[in-house]
Amino acid sequence: MEPVEYQVILTAQAGQLFAEMKDRREQQLLLARLEKLKHEPEKQGKALSEELTGYRSIRAVGQRYRIIYQIVEDKVLVVVVGIGRRKEGDKRDVYTVTMRLLVDMMLESESDDE
């Protein structure tokens, strides 16, 4: 059986985080890592917990960057919600920024429903 190839998309926020990166070489390395997510994304990285349950994280560009994503099985889709440096304890830490963006997206979604 032919392996399934997932489509990898970035949320607007993840795309913006990627575009704001200054180092083009690091961007290229991140793109190469994103490309690998097309094949068996569920076997890559690690499952996250607590506020990010349902998401996975992989390391990129050595150990400095994290790509945070969610797999949508029924659509054969990988949705990247966060890209950035791991800076534990820093407000710009990729996990901190991603959680803030996800909360903002939920609040926007709720206000659209009203």
Model-flagged regions — what are they?
Residues 1-33, 107-114:
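Arg/Lys-rich, positively charged N-terminal/basic patches that mediate binding to nucleic acids
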Residues 7, 62-65, 70-114:
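Enriched for short, Lys/Arg-rich terminal
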Residues 16, 20, 32, 36, ...:
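Charged/polar, solvent-exposed surface patches and flexible loops
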Residues 19-27, 50-52, 60-65, 85-89:
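Short, charged helix-to-loop "capping" segments that act as catalytic/coupling loops
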Residues 22-25, 38, 52, 56, ...:
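Generic secondary-structure transition motif, activating predominantly at the C-termini of alpha-helices
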Residues 26, 30-33, 44, 48, ...:
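Amphipathic alpha-helical interface surfaces
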Residues 35-60:
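A short, surface-exposed loop/turn module that caps and links secondary-structure elements
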